[in-house]
Amino acid sequence: MSDEESGISILRRVSALVLAAIVAAGCLTTAFAPVAAADPVSDDRLVDVRTVVPDAVVDLRYATTDNFVGEQLYPTGSRCLVHESMAHGLAVAAARLRPERLVFWDCYRPHEVQVRMFEVVPNPAWVARPGTAARSHEAGRSVDVTIAGADMGTGFDDFTARSRAYATEGVNAAARANRARLRDAMQAGGLSVYEGEWWHFDGPGADQPRPFPKVPLP
């Protein structure tokens, strides 16, 4: 074999080894790549809460008739969607509460649902007046939550003074302690309670006006 032929043979072997290494690396990258979150909603940066709190109890009351309107306002099979800026905080809160579980009563709320709610209860003290921009639930930046099985003193959407986050009159000591535990866990994740409702927590920038998300719930 001439020197030229020998050089070509060596070059071919080296090329084959490099190609094999590239293929192997690609396989490893694929095998260990992070798994994409289920059902991400990238356009409006909303995510399914179960992708960040896998053991969440999702009990969307507005997907049933068990709510103050008495109507099913969300389609059957609706997801609990939150803005991605809340994801880390909710994961922290859930970790603080385990083995108890977070129950989600409401997350992202479409604008037309907010309009219907205000038609039924046109009192801004209890139902936010629909505006021309998305805030809070309408932007996916607020959640309504409780602790599974815990006595909290009232049910969801109880339009009485006992629903206030720091209420004492008519709220027993155990319920006050449970509300405090929920607040502490959520605050550890950077989420703040709305003083008018012990179950309502806001994420970063919840009060800032934003475009309405165009996101399907189911």
Residue ranges and their predicted role:
Residues 110:
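Segments that shape or occlude catalytic/ligand-binding pockets
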Residues 4-19:
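Bacterial N-terminal signal peptides that target proteins for export
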Residues 2, 20, 26-107, 117-218:
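Extracytoplasmic cell-surface/polysaccharide-interacting catalytic and binding patches
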Residues 113-114:
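Short, well-ordered surface patches within globular domains
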